[in-house]
């Protein structure tokens, strides 16, 4: 059986926790058009990582077979 291919775009966007059970992603809406967004919104609510929802986690794992 041939090796499974990893989707490279997904590999750059998702990381796994140390235990390998959960998948993290970067929060959206922080690339451009930032001048009208408040500091509280940009730095507190949009900073850091968040978990991928349970509904999407199965699709992400299919894209990244060797997580």
UniProtKB/Swiss-Prot annotation:
GO-annotated cellular components: cytosolic large ribosomal subunit
Gene3D superfamilies in the cross-refs: 4.10.410.60
Keyword line: Ribonucleoprotein, Ribosomal protein
Pfam families: Ribosomal_L35p
InterPro entries given in the database record: Ribosomal_bL35, Ribosomal_bL35-like, Ribosomal_bL35_CS, Ribosomal_bL35_sf
Stored PANTHER family: 54S RIBOSOMAL PROTEIN BL35M, LARGE RIBOSOMAL SUBUNIT PROTEIN BL35M
Similarity comment: Belongs to the bacterial ribosomal protein bL35 family.
Entry protein name: Large ribosomal subunit protein bL35
């Amino acid at each position: 059986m041939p090796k499974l291919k990893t989707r490279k775009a997904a590999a750059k966007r998702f990381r796994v926790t140390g235990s390998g059970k959960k998948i993290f992603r970067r929060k959206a809406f922080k690339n451009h058009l930032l001048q009208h967004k408040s500091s509280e919104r940009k730095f507190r609510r949009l900073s850091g990582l968040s978990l991928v929802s349970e509904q999407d986690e199965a699709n992400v794992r299919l894209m990244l077979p060797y997580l």
